[in-house]
A protein has these predicted regions:
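Mature-chain termini and adjacent capping regions
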Residues: 1-162
């Protein structure tokens, strides 16, 4: 089975944020972090040059947008597997839906398996991934998506099922 992409305890953990600089706008609920930003929640870790965090009406982080050259995240998805690691020029994490969008040279890998494309949409709750190549001038996808599945882990690739 595909399982979920996060340890069950991760979503119940507090979110820790550190950065060189932080600015908070109380009216908009938007906090901007810049300079060596690191966000951690349970086994999830997100690193970027800049992160913008949007708060919902309950004063909880709802959407995190990370940019950097590149922004990186990792998360332990299964105690028996290595961490899932991703990187892209921009990573948008929706804490309410559990969906991570990676765009710009997006890469996701775990235990030797990898998927690479211009954009990757990764649902931590459903355990599925949508990958797209680079759009051409007409808007259709002309770039290719690259997937590597080592023979020893063909059934453990993110999104694969038994």
């Amino acid at each position: 089975s595909a399982g979920t992409f996060a340890l069950p305890s991760d979503r119940n953990q507090p979110i820790s944020l550190v950065a060189d600089r932080a600015t908070f706008n109380e009216k908009t609920g938007i906090t901007t972090y810049s300079g060596n930003v690191i966000i951690e929640q349970g086994s999830m870790k997100l690193q970027a040059n800049s992160i913008v965090a949007n708060m919902n009406s309950r004063k909880e982080i709802s959407v995190i947008t990370a940019t950097g050259g590149p922004a990186r995240f990792q998360q332990k998805t299964d105690p028996a597997k290595g961490p899932a690691k991703g990187q892209a020029q921009k990573i948008i994490y929706n804490a309410e839906t559990g969906i991570i969008n990676l765009s710009g040279n997006a890469l996701l890998e775990q235990d030797g398996a990898s998927i690479k494309g211009n954009t990757l949409k990764y649902s931590m709750n459903k355990g599925d991934i949508v990958a797209e190549g680079t759009p051409n001038k007409t808007g259709s996808s002309s770039g290719r998506v690259q997937i590597v599945i080592p023979s020893s882990s063909a059934k453990s690739f993110p999104g694969a099922s038994d």
